[in-house]
Amino acid sequence: YDHYKDRIEGMAISMPGIINPEIGYAFTGGALRYIDKMNIVDILKERCPINITIGNDAKCAANAEIGYGNLQDIQDGAVVILGTGIGGCLIKDHKVHTGRHFSAGEFSFVKTNCLDGISWDYAWSTRNGIKGLLERVQESLGTNQEYTGIEIFDMANEGNEKVIEGISQFCKEVATQIFNVHIIFDCEKVAIGGGISAQPLLIELINKHFDNIFDHLGFDVYK
């Protein structure tokens, strides 16, 4: 900071957790538990006395999509970020919907198994975070070998059918939860982010399974 302070007017930080951007407070830090219940802005201003703002990473992504990206033309929608967990944001009347306690869109906590509402094994973040992708691929291959996301999609793009089956199962689960979000919130669009969202195969398979849900719904519902 010292080296560039004469050129810096402000600082904006996108971070995980339930964040109150109005006062710069992190109720939680998401997976970064060591910053729970901290006023991050006050701490940073002790070292960097400039204008500083913080925001939940998925909500920051949603603001970017509303202002400059794929959600410029919608009033109501959602953002789903596939990463370590599941980042999420709801968009209402062309604005990020934070909720009364700044926790709207915390999709990581969504339960995917109504028969077990306790175990983290069935949280959306567990099933469809990057670890969930690895587990679906391992199950399909019948192995415990570790792979990175890059290695998984390299194998898929080379035509490994078992890997593609694992990715497809992962995408089926993602599509099911996106369907649930859509049915609850009546989204015009859902933007998918996160590093693996750059993989065309992932988006193709999510769309395929999303369409399949509607094809078998038996009712006319806005899509």
Task: Identify the residue ranges that each predicted region occupies.
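ATP-binding/phosphotransfer module of carbohydrate and carboxylate kinases, centering on a glycine-rich
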Residues: Y1-G10, I19-I23, E46-I50, G67-I74, ...
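Phosphate-binding/catalytic loop of phosphoryl-transfer enzymes
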Residues: G10-S14, I18-S119
